[in-house]
Amino acid sequence: MRFEFESDASSHLNEVLTELESVELENVEYEGPSLQNVSICASPSEKKRKWGTQDEFSLTENEENNEIETNEEMHVNSHDYAFPQEFFLKLLDIDMPLEQLSQHYFEDYKSNSADFMLTFINFALVASGCQPFVTNFDVQDVDSIPETLSQVNRSSFQKSSCAYTDYLYTSNSKEAKTVRIRFQLFLVEFISKVYVEDAFLGDSFMETTKAWIFTMTTSPWMLVRHTATTICCDIMRCLCLIVNKLSEKSNQTAEILVLRDLTSRFIDMIHDICDSVLFSRIHDIRASIRIVCVTALYDCCQLLPTYLINRNLIRHSGWGLSDAESQIRKISLKIIDYLSSHEPEKDQDFVVDFLDRFSLRIVEICRYDIDSVRSVALKTCEKLMEKISLNGKCINIVSSCIFDGKPQNRISTMRILVAHTNERYANYCEAKTATISLSKLLRREKIPLLVSSFESLFKMNALLFILEQGFESWFRDSSDHIFSRVKDDDKFVYQSQENNFYDADFIREYDMNNHRQQLIEESMHSIHTNSQLLASWEDVAKLLLYDRFDAKDTNSVLNPCIPSNAVIEFSSIYLHYFATHISKRSKKPGKRLEDEVVNQQQAMLRNLPLLLQKYRESCVSSYFFIKCVEQIPDELLYKREFHKDFSKLYKEILDIFNSTTVNFLMILCSRFFHRLAVNKVVQEDILFAIDNVYNDLAESLHEQLNAYIQRKKINKKNQLNGNDETQNLVLALNKFGCFAKEMVCLRDVNDWNIKLSEKLCEICSLEVGPIVCYSSLKVLFLLLLSDMRDRNCIFTNIFLKAAKVAKQKNGNSFLSKVFITITMLTLFLGSKANNWDINFSDDDLKLMNEEEIMEQIETFKAWSMKFKEKSSGNPSYFFSPEDTEEKELWNNLFEDWYPNRARDPGTLSHLVKGLKETADHLS
């Protein structure tokens, strides 16, 4: 925003504006006039005092005595210039009551108003750092105020040695703060006295003050402008406070007409200050001056909402929302918050129009501003919901705040979304029930539904839809993942159909950041605790399982209860975190809580097989539903009374494992099978079925390896990369690898292992692509680790032979520089950590000596830098689109070996830690 520098009232100062280009006042040191040594022609060598820097802003008794001697050095009689030293000292004297101080100066004002006004104006000048000061003649010559101020300013600030930045209204010293506070309170007492004693005296004081201070607010010198604006704001606060007190008295006294007349005068003065100073300086180029103005407006609004809340104030508050200074945006929001509940009746329509106009800007602040401002904006939005309806675009933006780091912000957001959901339901019912009741409409459906059930389904689906929009927007902004966006007139619609947002890439992005997962968990907890609609795991599951809709009936009243694909997949994430929360609660003591947790876990066991069956086509939903199973305790999972549900669950997970092509789901299903295999309570038929899964996978893989080798030998030139046969082989290798990684250490070496190892070694000796070679080596390596557990080392030579062949054939490939490094380093670390008795040959030891390993590590780090350079150019991909093989290999690398998929390849400690954990776990 570009701010207006000067108002029309400062046109007489145009001749000195050009001097600002050569003197930047905020970058030069200014030392204010000393309270001890004041001279019109102050020498640079004379002692000067900074506010709150080198010396304390106070005078000892000796210094007061020296003041008499100092005044003799002045070039002009003290009758002509009045330095407000006594005024400063009395303001500093905290032992002197303000009432006594105001009474003292009130008596002076009555006896000689000219001298008091001279002291008051000189106080404003010295507070600005000006010297020399003005005389009695200058004060009374109102018509020459602009020229007089111009001369004083030029004399004070012409030389850099006479310019400073630490002055009364910016100093943080204790003395300066005392003067500022007591001066403001002094004004309240003084103005009250002069008007109560004689209104004419008050008007005379205010007219002279306004003539000088108003002109000072248009000075081209920031120090003067800031001080004068602050004094005007102080006077305005005083007037508001006095009017506030008079309003209370007017209800308790018979002199109502007199008080009303006095109140009317004060109100006119307040509006005069607003129009002449605040509404002009609120657009000043200096943020400090704008802050003073907007703070004063907020303070005065609270004191006199009836008189001050008007269109001008509302309009300027709206402009403040786009100010570059965060404090101004924050205070402007507070003003809007206050006026939304205190606006006069005559301005209600204008306020509603204003809130509707600036609602988008407010919700943008909720989402994108700094933390302290966002908190105020969200509270303001809560008030907005009482006055206006936020449109779809605003709700989409504010819904992202449910994933804010501050709990209070999440609570405010949830209140806004729940209020919007209730409003949406009310509007829908009003539109549908214009001619017929809702209960009759529901009875017309194919399967009738109660009004209460319809309301619950409608609101749950509507709220989950809003939360999903917010989650998608927040997730995209907080990660490197890029999704297409379509702009609509009233809302942003983010394409979230299958294979777009919620896909395998989404799961990869979702799992790789522990900090973000923790924030999602906290946000889901806020959703659960602040919404009665989503407080039950079973109720949300019923929404997903409800299938009594007629999809062909586009006019059905139940259509808003049908969850979209995106809502279903987001709901699966929510149910996973809900299940985690239930699991954590089970560890807390308390019989009542324990019964509640058991009931919810039983509901999970009953509903999860149905959810997996209905949504098995969605990899994301299946992934999170299976993760929910991990939160069901073994003692419940294997109970005989739930054997039927458990058998259905096992069957559904097995079907997903057999049909899926997504690596994440293969790994998750394999972990489930491993959990069953290591538990002695599981029935024999289940264990036998798991054993058959391993044998079936091994047999199928062996057949595919045979067919691939035969096909390769027939057509040596064709590498078969990219065709269906190669893709099917890689899928089979990955599926067996996922299962073997979890199960192979529980099994003894059998014939299938030996047959597979021979075929895999043969694959590596052929001219195959890097993905096939990588997948083959990975499976062979898993068999090798299983073999090392029994210290048989049957596969050691086979693996080393295959690894060396792969290195020779792919010496400069991504595979050689990354995978060989990992496998060899794992063997090296594993043999050191677990005392594996492996008879390595001389060539093997040479391949695995420390120098060779360090060289490979450096190569790996170099590739890591290449990865970072590529990913920085296009954050949607880990590698550029044309490097498809490298991208796939890189992703497989982290999915297979890195703990928590922690993608920081430049950190060697992550690599070593992951390898060490893998070796320890599988040994």
UniProtKB/Swiss-Prot annotation:
Annotated Gene3D superfamilies: Leucine-rich Repeat Variant (1.25.10.10)
UniProt entry tagged with the keyword Lipid biosynthesis: no
Organism field: Schizosaccharomyces pombe (strain 972 / ATCC 24843)
A GO BP annotation: linear element assembly
GO cellular component: chromatin; cohesin complex; condensed chromosome; meiotic cohesin complex; nucleus
Keywords in alphabetical order: Meiosis
Sequence ranges assigned to domain SCD in this UniProt record: 278-365
Single annotated GO MF: chromatin binding
InterPro entries documented for this protein: ARM-like, ARM-type_fold, Cohesin_Scc3/SA, SCD, STAG
Protein origin, superkingdom: Eukaryota
Protein name: Meiotic recombination protein rec11
